[in-house]
């Protein structure tokens, strides 16, 4: 079977729902304890999920709306607080403290994040006042509507001591971020419809900006993928969530798709549990519209087992 573009269709696994009743889950991440953690935007909570039973428990309350998650080398959780543009740190006693104030270097809400093994956090922002525009018109689509022309945004590095540095500009809605074994940082540009790569230097600077994967025809029907959350899939491959088609695609450097997961509704974030075969975790919801997502609990965690890529 081939796609309309003539490419061989990638094998597709169908996900099953393991947890529902959420508002809008994002940033599925495996913690040092092996549990799965997600941010539920409109419940203002970080949830800890036991991957053996799929039971969820509140782990942190984030009134400013939680997003990206990661851990310092000592095991303390970092979580992006979107609306007040702070990076929070969960202490051993469960309290949240400010790890870094991002307000001076971000435009609009702070967004998704990746924390590397050295404890450096890499976080994007919206680039404009997305939520302010929606207050004026709750049904507007400031990102993809017919009159949408969002400005570009930045990527910020937060060092373990809380020092904040802008490391990249001109990104078209930087979203999910991950680091490959060779030191390549990959950033999903949602509005740009691509994955952009940088080389991370020893001192944490980003060099060699380049296109890692053009996703303009990478969808199941040869249509474009507007990448949201991403996760390392092993080697030079990345899982990419696809809100448009509903599901996730495993993308190699250069843009080839060699596996897909089909979900029951749009997929806004993806993670990987280190099982054999790998468990691909998809955060899905009926819509990303904040008004609708906050009013209804359509959010789900859906999973599928996908064998590792050959080679």
How should each PLM-predicted stretch be described?
Residues 19-36, 62-81, 86, 103-121, ...:
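Beta-rich, blade/repeat-based domains predominating
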């Amino acid at each position: 079977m081939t796609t309309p573009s003539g490419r061989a269709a990638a094998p597709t696994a169908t996900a099953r729902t393991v947890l529902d009743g959420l508002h809008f889950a994002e940033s599925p991440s495996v913690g040092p304890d092996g549990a799965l953690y997600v941010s539920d935007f409109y419940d203002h909570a970080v949830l800890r999920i036991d991957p053996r039973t799929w039971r969820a428990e509140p782990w942190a309350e984030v009134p400013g709306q939680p997003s990206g998650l990661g851990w310092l080398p000592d095991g303390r959780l970092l979580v992006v607080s979107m609306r007040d543009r702070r990076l929070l740190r969960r202490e051993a006693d469960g309290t949240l403290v400010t790890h870094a104030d991002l307000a001076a270097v971000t435009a609009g809400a702070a967004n998704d994040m990746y924390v590397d093994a050295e404890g450096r956090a890499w976080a994007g922002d919206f680039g404009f006042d997305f939520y302010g525009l929606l207050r004026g018109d709750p049904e507007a689509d400031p990102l993809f509507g017919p009159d949408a022309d969002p400005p570009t945004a930045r990527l910020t590095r937060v060092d373990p001591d809380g020092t904040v540095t802008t490391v990249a500009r001109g990104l078209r809605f930087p979203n999910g971020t991950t680091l490959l074994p060779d030191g390549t940082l990959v950033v999903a540009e949602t509005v740009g419809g691509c994955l952009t790569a940088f080389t991370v230097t020893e001192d944490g600077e980003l060099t060699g900006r380049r296109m890692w994967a053009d996703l303009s025809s990478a969808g199941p029907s040869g249509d474009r993928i507007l990448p949201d959350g991403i996760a390392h899939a092993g080697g030079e491959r990345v899982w990419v969530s696809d809100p448009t088609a509903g599901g996730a695609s495993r993308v190699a450097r250069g843009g080839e798709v060699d596996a897909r997961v089909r979900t029951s509704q749009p997929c806004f974030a993806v993670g990987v549990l280190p099982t054999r075969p790998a468990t691909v975790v998809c955060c899905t919801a009926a819509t990303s519209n904040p008004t609708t997502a906050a009013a209804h609990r359509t959010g789900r965690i859906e999973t599928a087992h996908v064998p590792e890529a050959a080679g």
